[in-house]
């Protein structure tokens, strides 16, 4: 990205970061409310189908809100923030083989339990699980490594642009903790920051 494409003031940079974060939350919230309302009237044959539709809705709505603010609010392009539909072959390979590897490890150290799901239900559950991961991964990467990182880099420097989004990434995951302990929160912040870097 050419840094001369935009040069926001400190306050404008912080406001833009806040707006993108709120759009990130709004995409998920509005999608959840819409699908919960819709499916309170329409019954689906499977909970996994609900998850599939909700994750697709959240992904598309969040991406649309990001695009709308970027192009109409800031009069910039998505590629100005490093966001392009360019998919690398090695990325696809890693995204397929890493879950297979992790599943194999769990299968070796865990115990098998027989479930009563049909083949169709198992397929829906697998697709739902993949969409949960894709939705989270894509929208979080757009927010933290796209918008926030590029805004901070444009205003300050690459070190701040790497550290702050990584730290914010870890803070966003605190509410997903099952139990709150000081050591648990500190471990999440440290590991989330390291993963983000």
Task: Specify the residue positions occupied by each region the protein language model found.
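N-terminal, membrane-interfacial amphipathic/helix-forming hydrophobic leader that caps
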Residues: 1-78
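Helix-boundary and loop/linker segments of multi-pass membrane transporters
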Residues: 5-13, 44, 81-85, 116-124, ...
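Small-polar-interrupted transmembrane alpha-helices in polytopic inner-membrane proteins
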Residues: 158-174, 189-192
């Amino acid at each position: 990205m050419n840094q001369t494409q935009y040069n926001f003031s400190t306050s404008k940079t912080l406001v833009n970061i806040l707006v993108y974060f709120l759009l990130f939350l709004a995409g998920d919230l509005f999608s959840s409310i819409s699908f919960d309302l819709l499916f309170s009237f329409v019954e689906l044959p499977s909970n996994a189908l609900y998850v599939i539709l909700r994750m697709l809705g959240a992904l598309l709505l969040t991406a649309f809100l990001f695009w709308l603010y970027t192009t109409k609010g800031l009069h910039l392009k998505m590629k100005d923030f490093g966001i392009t539909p360019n998919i690398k072959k090695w990325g696809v390979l890693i995204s397929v083989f890493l879950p297979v590897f992790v599943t194999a490890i769990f299968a070796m150290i865990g115990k098998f339990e027989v479930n009563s799901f049909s083949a169709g239900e198992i397929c829906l559950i697998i697709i739902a699980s993949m969409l949960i991961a894709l939705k989270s991964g894509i929208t979080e990467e757009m927010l933290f490594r796209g918008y926030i990182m590029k805004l901070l880099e444009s205003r300050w420097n690459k070190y701040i642009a790497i550290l702050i989004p990584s730290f914010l990434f870890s803070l966003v995951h605190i509410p997903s903790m099952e139990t709150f302990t000081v050591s648990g929160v500190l471990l999440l912040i440290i590991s989330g920051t390291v993963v983000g870097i």
